[in-house]
Amino acid sequence: MASWPPLELQSSNQSQLFPQNATACDNAPEAWDLLHRVLPTFIISICSFGLLGNLFVLLVFLLPRRRLNVAEIYLANLAASDLVFVLGLPFWAENIWNQFNWPFGALLCRGINGVIKANLFISIFLVVAISQDRYCLLVHPMASRRRQRRRQARVTCVLIWVVGGLLSIPTFLLRSIQAVPDLNITACILLLPHEAWHFARIVELNILAFLLPLAAIVFFNYHILASLRGREEVSRTRCGGRKDSKTTALILTLVVAFLVCWAPYHFFAFLEFLFQVQAIRGCFWEDFIDLGLQLANFLAFTNSSLNPVIYVFVGRLFRTKVWELYKQCTPKSLAPISSSHRKEIFQLFWRN
């Protein structure tokens, strides 16, 4: 096949790596040319927004002199995971600009792909953990103790990072630099030692990294929404009820955005597996899967830069924390500005 997505979808067959020259099915050369021109710029844009946005989120969470609550612990870890992920994207942008001739050596070939694979697991496991915490808080509030939940959140995040790292070890070990004489390049490819690895990889990718977490996410959030609808009055009377509702709205938005960004990737990954085992055949499916994988990969990438935008526009409490951080960092010698004076300043600023 022709797919060349960075998220470890390559076959060990070299003839499946490059769309223009390496396959008998060449029905969409214009689409591939367009993708190769557009994708590097798109990747760099995602990297820039993701780097600045997630750094900003981490600063807002970590700079204030106070302890993080449970939701903030999970969201800070999610931002850290996204930040580590986007740091690897410029290498893939350069790889595409360089016609897939990997210029960074074998160690970075393994390391960058290992980081990308680890992020895939860490991100979705964190989303599951966030949903589970909201479920316990809203559906079983009497069983949730703040101090205990905070300790559990820290331990859970450490375990998620460790498990994500362990699950990325096969990628680190099986990625390699290999010459492709027909194209006169040296490519960073995934070398699967046996055909059985294709099945093991799709089980890991589609079931462990998506379907099982998706089932847990749907279960938790279904009961969260039912609890919010059925116990609205109770939530208002509980201490912190309004705050919990705002935090839950933010988390539900993050969950939906995550699923929208990542579901197409797993759909096309499963189609690729069906093509590899010849359950589906033909040039139409090959081109459809190859192009779909490329687009789905980079739709998934956007999630890492989309989360900070969600924090700002959906997270009302997050915006409050930004304002508190601003006041904390502003010199106390500066006199506070009255609302009327502030309005005059804004009018002068926006006046042409």
UniProtKB/Swiss-Prot annotation:
Membrane spanning residue stretches: 42-62, 73-93, 111-131, 154-174, 207-227, 251-271, 295-315
Gene3D superfamilies in UniProt: Rhodopsin 7-helix transmembrane proteins
A biological process from GO: cell chemotaxis
Cytoplasmic compartment spans: 63-72, 132-153, 228-250, 316-352
Cysteine pairs bridged by disulfides in the record: 109-188
GO cellular component: external side of plasma membrane
Glycosylation sites: 13, 21, 184
Source taxon at top rank: Eukaryota
Recorded topology in the membrane: Multi-pass membrane protein
Pfam families with a match to the protein in the record: 7tm_1
Entry-linked PROSITE patterns: G_PROTEIN_RECEP_F1_2 (PS50262)
Record keywords, A-Z: Cell membrane, Disulfide bond, G-protein coupled receptor, Glycoprotein, Lipoprotein, Membrane, Palmitate, Receptor, Transducer, Transmembrane, Transmembrane helix
Keyword Transmembrane (UniProt): yes
Localization annotation: Cell membrane
Covalently attached lipid (S-palmitoyl cysteine), positions: 329
Extracellular topological intervals: 1-41, 94-110, 175-206, 272-294
Any one GO molecular-function label of the UniProt entry: bradykinin receptor activity
Recorded family membership: Belongs to the G-protein coupled receptor 1 family. Bradykinin receptor subfamily. BDKRB1 sub-subfamily.
Known function: This is a receptor for bradykinin. Could be a factor in chronic pain and inflammation.
Name of the protein this chain belongs to: B1 bradykinin receptor
Source organism per UniProt: Chlorocebus aethiops
